[in-house]
Amino acid sequence: MGQKINPLGFRLGTTQSHHSVWFAQPKNYSGGLQEDKKIKDCIKNYVQKNRKISSGVEGIARIKIKKRIDLIQVIIYMGFPKFLEGNPQGIEELQSNIQKEFNSVNQKLNIAITRIAKPYGQPNILAEFIAGQLKNRVSFRKAMKKAIELTEQADTKGIQIQIAGRIDGKEIARVEWIREGRVPLQTIRAKIDYCSYTVRTIYGALGIKIWIFAGEE
């Protein structure tokens, strides 16, 4: 059996960089990790509550957290940041929500929103799109093909999508996948973006995995 390594961890230091940039003493490290998770959960919950119901996609590609002694800087990379862009009240509300989670008085919090030019070239946004389709009982093949069409508009070199679970409500769980273009997982210099996403449907949980090949360094 082939041993499948996480494509992001495999490429750290070459084509991938860390999403959390900070140092901590070994005894404080676990606290820092929990802090990061709280920040990310808080942002995702806020976006979920405030986004327009029609779009169905949160549009968060990734969240980068940089910490200094006196400052926590959070950069949110979004595909569709309409309700936060040009809305200082929204960002202030989000900031106060995050600060409620922490009791550190001496650290200032700074939130920045960065818009992504081609949102459907990001696996997280694509996985949310597929999840929305599956929840609306669209057939999985149709959802996969539509997702591939969207990535082709984003100038990607290749994509692989895998869905596992009780697909279309069948009794027996199975794995279905589709690949378009090249996805060289063993080439370290290949820029590959990956995400795994769980979607809860009325039949049970489905796992979606997406690999996107953006080119070689």
From Swiss-Prot:
**Where is it predominantly found?**
plastid
Annotated ranges, domain KH type-2: 43-117
Source domain of life is Eukaryota
InterPro entries according to UniProt: KH_dom-like_a/b (IPR015946), KH_sf_prok-type (IPR009019), Ribosomal_S3_C_sf (IPR036419), Ribosomal_uS3_bac-typ (IPR005704), Ribosomal_uS3_C (IPR001351), Ribosomal_uS3_CS (IPR018280)
Q: Where in the cell is it found?
A: Plastid, Chloroplast
GO CC annotation terms, alphabetical: chloroplast; cytosolic small ribosomal subunit
Keywords, in A-Z order: Chloroplast, Plastid, Ribonucleoprotein, Ribosomal protein, RNA-binding, rRNA-binding
Respond yes or no to whether keyword Ribonucleoprotein is given for this record: yes
Q: Which GO terms describe its biological process?
A: translation
Cite a single GO MF annotation: structural constituent of ribosome
Q: Is Glycoprotein among the key words of this record?
A: no
Family from the record = Belongs to the universal ribosomal protein uS3 family.
Subunit structure, as described in the record: Part of the 30S ribosomal subunit.
Descriptive protein name: Small ribosomal subunit protein uS3c
Q: Which organism is it from?
A: Ranunculus macranthus (Large buttercup)
Q: Which gene encodes it?
A: rps3
